């Protein structure tokens, strides 16, 4: 274990490798645990939030002339991006945004399938179509992330590959928005998340869809897809440059146990760390040929158990907070017996989101109304209404795809 040295924040210099703070990282605006100071802004931020820190002299590189153009792959750069930024305000209610989001979502799935067809046929990826859809997706999520996140809960067994690409893009942009990334960075993240798995097109379909265990040779073929994705994106043009590292590194792990290069720690860029988390979350919560989908809380539990080992600890904590206890799209039963769908998360109180009521306490269709559990909703006896449990997809015949296709009409109660 390398020696660490305690140092007053007023003595910090550019090039010092900060490995520990005088308080929990989660209580500060710094995204990643441990980073090398690259600018005077990093120093000022540490001085604002800490009294002292611990540095590792063995990896510190003191430079009296700070780099005026910090490396965007280094944690310090991204910590500065997230400094003193709050999650943007929602500008469009979910019931309005979801209609437009559904159109964008359908276009995205269609566009990804066309891209996949082009790649298989050896044609160039349609850059303009990708750029248009990425821009529309980012704009929708910036207006209201819950609408697009709701759509990730809808599943089509016939389009698992394109669906995973689109879901990963949506979740990544929503995550980037949540931690305060500016729109220009959200678009770069979106490109990488959308294209991170295109190398799987070079893996035989019968292997990808094999319900049983893979042979050693088949595992090797599957594990080659990050390198295949990188090669495809490197030849696709400069617009796809931000996607190259994300595609190549999304199966790497913080402890070095991932593939294809066995990278660890700060060798992994922030975007690749983010997409690594989201890739696993979406795969776990989507039905696969080899297993049923898992409920979101099981996927979040897995991420939480492996934070600091396989996944970035700080990012996992933030991702779990963003997704919440009852993710958007969850079908829930309330303590008064009514059945509804979570349509808006509550970042300040994860246990009390907004719920679109679908069935009354007798499990019969009722007037569609939205109840805000955070506003002290009560039943007819004056008892607080809470979520009693989460139900499985399709329980009581609730079809969310049909609901969205028909257009959502409801009354907001409180």
Which residues fall in each region the model found?
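Histidine- and acidic-residue-rich, metal-dependent catalytic cores
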Residues: 98-414
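Membrane-cytosol interface segments
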Residues: 1-125, 381, 387-414
